[in-house]
Amino acid sequence: MANAALCASGTVTLESAILGVPHLIVYRGSFGMRLQYQLVKHKIGYIGLPNLLLDASICPELLDTAATPERIADECTALLLDEERARAQKDGFARLMELLGQPGVIRRAAERILDVARRTQA
């Protein structure tokens, strides 16, 4: 199992969390994606699925211009060397697993994601 991961925003962030792998979420999108995110970020606050589902900043997110090689390297290095930081993510993943539970995890995750989507339309 990996000690840390660098993930593009998407389902891989939830998969990494379920596997208990601390990770950094990075995404650089098109102009349209950036504009869309700017319009809804005050309503949702996060882009990574673990953060969205827990409504908390569990995994660091570097988006667009913040996703510089230096920042990515610094964050990944911190995940690998700072045991407290990695432990904090793993504790968050444990809360995520409690939220998602055992049977019906896909349905519950989808419902939470739909709740967030509905908030952005309100």
Where are each of the predicted segments found?
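Nucleotide-activated sugar donor-binding and catalytic core shared by glycosyltransferases
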Residues: M1-A122
